[in-house]
Design a protein with these regions (language model features):
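Acidic/polar-rich alpha-helix caps and helix-coil junctions
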Residues: 3, 11-196
């Protein structure tokens, strides 16, 4: 298990096959219209109460993940694997937990040379940092996020915010020009860098 998990979530209580209460971390995927019959883990309220006061605008681990991505893409001549591992370790230090021995020997956490792996760990590192996870997903398409009938936009992820109503009213002429240029003012309209 990732040692950051108890910081991010609390264990849920469910019944096992014998009717006994069992506490464990239970994730619920997004995109489902019907509520599951299991009780999922909730965010850790203690962390939620203190995280906004103690999180920097850009953490050291985020800088290292950016550098790991640049190295993975061949933009800088550095070791992407070393940067990835340093980024994960820096994030664990940020949360006050130790990197478990053998953490990078696990196939689910070992650097495999892909942007996807970097972005999965960056997603965890950006927990409690406003909308940054969403921006990173929109920019890269990672991590894989399931969609389905429970997502308000159906099978499409939201890519952008709609123009505010006040702007639509107060600057109508330019708003209409912008909408015409983009194709629509819908939250599923892809942004220019997503259309390439």
């Amino acid at each position: 298990n990732d040692p950051r998990l108890p910081i991010f979530a609390v264990k849920a209580t469910n019944k096992d096959e014998n009717g006994k209460d069992v506490k464990d971390y239970v994730g619920l995927q997004s995109g489902y219209a019907d509520m599951p019959t299991i009780n999922g883990s909730a965010p850790n309220a203690t962390t939620l109460a203190t995280a906004p006061q103690s999180i920097a605008l850009m953490t050291y681990s985020e800088v290292l993940f950016i550098k790991a991505e640049l190295a993975q893409r061949g933009i800088i001549q550095q070791d992407a694997a070393a940067l990835y591992e340093a980024a994960v370790e820096a994030n664990m230090q940020q949360w006050g937990v130790e990197l478990p021995a053998g953490y990078f020997e696990n196939p689910k956490t070992a650097y495999d040379g892909t942007l996807k792996r970097i972005m999965e760990q960056k997603f965890y590192a950006l927990f409690f940092i406003d909308f940054q996870q969403w921006f990173e997903y929109n920019r890269t398409g990672y991590p894989d996020v399931p969609t389905g009938p429970g997502v308000a936009t159906g099978d499409a992820m939201p890519y952008r915010y709609k123009y505010p109503a006040i702007l639509q009213r107060m600057n109508r002429e330019n708003y209409l020009k912008a909408v015409e240029s983009m194709g629509s003012d819908d939250i599923t309209t892809k942004l220019i860098w997503q259309k390439r």
